[in-house]
């Protein structure tokens, strides 16, 4: 591991995925599905949460993240990526992820397929703190 890395991140793959179309479960081909937190001090990025759903999101759609009884919206989407609209929303999401046990992430593909991905949050706080420490923030 580098002593002074320019980027640090944590990443998790889902423990469970589900896709539905017209209310019916369907099998779909998706590329990597991941939930990220990125630290890039030179760009003033500190714990930016993002999600890649493994498919291009429907234009104008948002991605919803449910942690316990907290709901968060990733309103910024670009291709297969989604993230919170601003620092405040990102910080609120991080607080929920630190307190939670699992996160459910809901999205809609450009073909109209709805997805639900389940991520374990066990170890999230420790991993986030380690990434933060390594990137000197």
Task: Name these PLM-found stretches.
Residues 1-137:
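A generic "folded-domain core" signal
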């Amino acid at each position: 591991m580098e002593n002074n890395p320019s980027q640090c991140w944590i990443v998790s793959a889902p423990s469970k995925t589900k896709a539905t179309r017209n209310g019916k479960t369907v099998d779909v081909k998706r590329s990597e599905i991941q939930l990220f937190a990125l630290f890039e001090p030179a760009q003033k990025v500190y714990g930016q949460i993002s999600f890649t759903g493994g498919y291009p999101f429907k234009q104008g759609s948002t991605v919803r993240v449910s942690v316990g009884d907290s709901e968060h919206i990733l309103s910024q989407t670009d291709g297969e990526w989604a993230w919170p609209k601003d620092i405040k929303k990102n910080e609120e999401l991080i607080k929920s992820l630190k307190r939670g046990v699992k996160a459910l992430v809901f999205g809609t593909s450009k073909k109209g397929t709805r997805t639900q991905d389940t991520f374990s949050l066990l170890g999230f706080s420790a991993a986030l703190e380690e990434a933060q420490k390594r990137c000197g923030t």
